[in-house]
Curated annotation (Swiss-Prot):
Coiled coil: none annotated. HAMAP family: AroQ. This is 3-dehydroquinate dehydratase. Substrate binds at residues 73, 79, 86, 100-101, 110. Its EC number is 4.2.1.10. The record marks 17 as: Transition state stabilizer. Homododecamer. Gene3D superfamilies: Dehydroquinase, class II (3.40.50.9100). Pathway: Metabolic intermediate biosynthesis; chorismate biosynthesis; chorismate from D-erythrose 4-phosphate and phosphoenolpyruvate: step 3/7. It comes from Herpetosiphon aurantiacus (strain ATCC 23779 / DSM 785 / 114-95). It catalyses: 3-dehydroquinate = 3-dehydroshikimate + H2O. Pfam families: DHquinase_II (PF01220).
Length: 144
């Protein structure tokens, strides 16, 4: 099983950016924890982080027909990234949307996700471990 892990704008600054909201774990540390768990389950992960929506869409197009699922934290693109949402929709694979903070307990503009309606599920507010929970879902799906 091959999964694509997409990280949106500003996630490259995890560990430094507002640690009281997003925690002190770096993106590299999150990816390393995911890679370790995935490897033991026989799952291959490809990671991409970009601050540019078009790069994320191009990445989806490059992986079309080559992956079995997507784990995505769209960052601020969650709320208005329509080209990203459309790119995700054309992939025809399960998508799990992850957010480090509980977006529904924050500012009202963060409560709407353009991705949620096309995602299999959403994990919000469980910190960096939310990525591992998303990966667990794919591991269980692979085993079924």
């Amino acid at each position: 099983m091959q999964l694509l892990v997409l990280q949106g704008p500003n996630l490259n600054m995890l560990g430094q950016r507002e640690p009281t909201i997003y925690g002190s774990t770096s993106l590299a540390d999150i990816h390393n924890a995911m890679r370790e768990k995935a490897t033991s389950a026989g799952i291959e992960l490809s990671f991409i982080q970009s601050n540019h929506e078009g790069v994320l869409v191009d990445t989806l197009h490059a992986h079309y027909g080559k992956i079995q699922g997507i784990i995505i934290n769209p960052g601020a693109l969650t709320h208005y990234g329509l080209s990203l949402r459309d790119g995700l929709a054309l992939m025809d694979v399960p998508i799990i949307e992850v957010h480090l903070s509980n977006v529904y307990a924050r500012e009202a503009f963060r409560h709407h996700s353009v991705v949620a309606a096309i995602a299999q599920g959403q994990i919000s507010g469980l910190g960096w471990q939310g990525y591992l929970y998303a990966l667990d879902w794919f591991i269980q799906r692979k085993s079924a």
